[in-house]
Every structure is written in C-alpha cells, then in structure tokens.
C-alpha cells in the first residue's frame, strides 16, 4: 500500500499485530462459521441466528477497543456459495493519539457466487494526533452480493475535540471478477484546508460511506434507479444529509454532518430497504446495536 508522505517514518519492528480470519458457508439449513482463526486480542464475541432464513450474525471485538500507534490490525472474511453473513461490532472503534507512530487497519472481504456479506461496523472515532492508515479491499464473484459501510468521526465530540494534528488515509476498492468497480481514496492532515473547504468536510465532524451490490437479477439500471428514488424520498422524510448515486450497478450513499447517530440511523434505514427489495428479508438490526 502506498504510504502518504505526511506520515513520519516508522520501523516495522515497532508494529503490534492482530489478525482475524473468518469463513462462512451454508450447511443446507443456515449459514455457519466454518473457519475461524485469530492472532492477538481480536476475535468473535458471539454468533446469532435471529432470522428464520438462517442468516448468521457475527459480532467481532477488539478488546483494547481501539488502535494505537504501532498497531497493525487485519480482518479477512470470506463467504461460500449460498451463505449470508452479517458482521458487526459491539461499539465504536477508535484511532488513538499515537505520538507520531503509524497505526494500520486492513480489511479483506471475499464473497463467492450466490452469497451475501453485510459488513456493518459501528463508527470509528479519529482522535486528535492520530496517524492512521486504513484500507478495505473487496472481491466479489459474478453473482455475489454485498452491503457495507464506513462511518468516521473526527475528534471526541463529547470533549469538543477537533482534528488539529495527525494524518488519516483511507483506501477503498471493490472488484467483481477481478474488474475494478469502485476506487475511493481519502487522505488528509490535521488542520488541512480540506476539513473546512466546501469541497471537503465543510467544517463538519462526521462522514460516512455506504456501498451495496445487488443480486445479479436486480442489477438492471431500471430496477436500481427505482430503488434509489424510493430511498431518496425516505432520506428526505428523515431529514438527514445523505446523497445517493449509482456507479454502474453499485449503490453509493454519502453522509456529511455532525451527528453520528443520524448517520447510523440513515444507513441502517437504507440497508433495511435494500434487504426488502433485493432479498425479501426483514430489517433485522443486529441486537448489539440496541445495547
């Protein structure tokens, strides 16, 4: 991964590694976790099957509750044919102040034909003076489906903290059959003009991105445009600062504001609608979100 020039040099021996590998398959009745391997304090807290269709809800937890300078955290998740998994976290993630040390997070998702993965972590807080690099790489087979989001909060809002120093870089890539469908790159420093510019954050503290790929039979532009228009009307009724676009057959929603709960609720509502349209499933929010 290309490193931003704004990051201070970091020796690899100072890095602290944690890794979690998960695999899901359909056993004929429900989706089960057939592969689980972890290194360091990151693991699956609980698996639940709250839906009659056998969708597996997995809660992953990183006990230190955040990523500090020198940490190197990796998630690898794969699904086999006909599996449907929902992966979430019990609370907000955190990028801690690092005293100049870099921190890394890598997310690799591989989704097989006729399977679905919903990657739904709760928000991530970027502390002032954090040096953070994050990447998400998603590979879908031709008939695979995906929904996922990323929500970032600049500073600790309860302390009125802003992002005055440090650096953040995020790279998102989504492929289908090894063809790049979406590439999204974000990079900024503390006090960067982009944070106050109307072409960037415009002084806001919360940003979010939502991505979704429909089952193959719903990828026609006519279907997707109808679904997006209905969701736009819902966002207007909810009075949230969300925009929706269609990138080929990938649905993209963006949030820019100051209320992370509003971002979460908006994205959860979009997910609920797409589940109904594409899979004939109820919204079925992960129970951990209500605790």
From Swiss-Prot:
One of its GO terms (molecular function) is nickel cation binding. The keyword Cytoplasm applies. GO terms for cellular component: cytoplasm. It is found in: Cytoplasm. Pfam families: UreD. Keywords: Chaperone, Cytoplasm, Nickel insertion. InterPro entries: UreD. The keyword Chaperone applies. It comes from the Bacteria. Coiled coil: none annotated. UreD, UreF and UreG form a complex that acts as a GTP-hydrolysis-dependent molecular chaperone, activating the urease apoprotein by helping to assemble the nickel containing metallocenter of UreC. The UreE protein probably delivers the nickel. PANTHER family: UREASE ACCESSORY PROTEIN D. Belongs to the UreD family. Required for maturation of urease via the functional incorporation of the urease nickel metallocenter. This is Urease accessory protein UreD. It comes from Acinetobacter baylyi (strain ATCC 33305 / BD413 / ADP1). The gene is ureD.
């Amino acid at each position: 991964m290309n490193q931003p020039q704004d990051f201070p040099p970091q020796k690899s021996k100072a890095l602290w590694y944690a890794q979690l590998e998960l695999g899901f398959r359909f056993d004929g009745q429900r989706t089960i976790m057939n592969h689980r391997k972890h290194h360091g304090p990151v693991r699956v807290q609980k698996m639940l099957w709250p839906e009659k269709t056998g969708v597996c809800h997995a809660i992953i937890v990183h006990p230190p509750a955040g990523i500090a300078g020198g940490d190197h955290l990796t998630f690898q998740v794969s699904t086999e044919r006909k599996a449907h998994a929902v992966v979430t976290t019990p609370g907000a993630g955190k990028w801690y102040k690092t005293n100049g040390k870099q921190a890394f997070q890598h997310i690799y998702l591989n989704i097989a034909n006729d399977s679905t993965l919903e990657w739904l972590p709760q928000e991530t807080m970027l502390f002032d003076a954090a040096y953070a690099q994050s990447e998400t790489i998603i590979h879908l087979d031709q008939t695979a489906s995906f929904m996922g989001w990323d929500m970032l909060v600049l500073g600790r809002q309860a302390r009125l903290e802003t992002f005055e120093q440090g650096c953040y870089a995020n790279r998102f890539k989504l492929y289908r059959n090894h063809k790049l469908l979406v590439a999204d790159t974000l990079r900024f420093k503390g006090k960067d003009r982009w944070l106050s510019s109307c072409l960037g954050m415009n002084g806001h503290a919360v940003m979010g991105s939502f991505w979704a790929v429909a089952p193959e039979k719903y990828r026609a532009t006519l279907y997707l445009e109808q679904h997006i228009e209905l969701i736009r009307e819902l966002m207007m009724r909810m009075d949230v600062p969300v925009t929706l676009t269609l990138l080929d057959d990938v649905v993209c929603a963006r949030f820019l504001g100051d209320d992370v709960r509003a971002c979460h609720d908006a994205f959860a509502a979009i997910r609920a609608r797409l589940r109904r349209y594409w899979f004939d499933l109820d919204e079925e929010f992960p129970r951990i979100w209500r605790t």
